[in-house]
Amino acid sequence: RSELAAVRKTAGNAGDPNRKVSKKERDLITLRNKLRDDWIKSEYTQVTLNDRQATVYEKGSEQWKAAIEKAAKAYEEMFFKHDVRLVGLICRVQQMRCLTELGRFDAALDCLPDVTDYEESDNAQLRKVWFDSFVLELEALIGKGDLQRAVQIATKTRLTKAEQRTPQAKKILFLRAKAELALAEKLGPDKKKDKAKLLADAKRVL
């Protein structure tokens, strides 16, 4: 407790750019950062326990739905608490996953604005946040029946070479083909060329 009080006091004093910071103060600031990181990790672990609890129930059951709802809410709270940190963005994507599993596709897609900006990021961790959200975006679009949009973004989005070797890339191709096949089924007889193109591309990517 005394260490934590000293850390808080030092952290406040160190905010003055004209003030020389001693080694002891630097050590205390390092300790503060470690304590904060450890606390955030413990928070995240607690949140994921809600998620894991759902696995003991039969998928689709009322108990499963209640557990996933609880997890989605916990992830959302964690996101708003740490939205400027990586862990907050990860929680936003996990919330999106929970909502998609519950069939709440519009609510899941509402999470996207918080993570889509990282598609062009050079930071591998932030890029992964976007990559994970992209897979969920496709699932949500297909789930709500917006097949045209799903096909459009699946065919236009470019993945890095490293991403192309991941299991998620295979899932993206599967979802792309799934959307193309479903969209082809909906096209009328006046759209034979479009239908043939969709079927051919689905066959190619599978």
Model regions and ranges:
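Acidic, polar-rich low-complexity tracts and alpha-helical solenoid repeat scaffolds
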Residues: 1-206
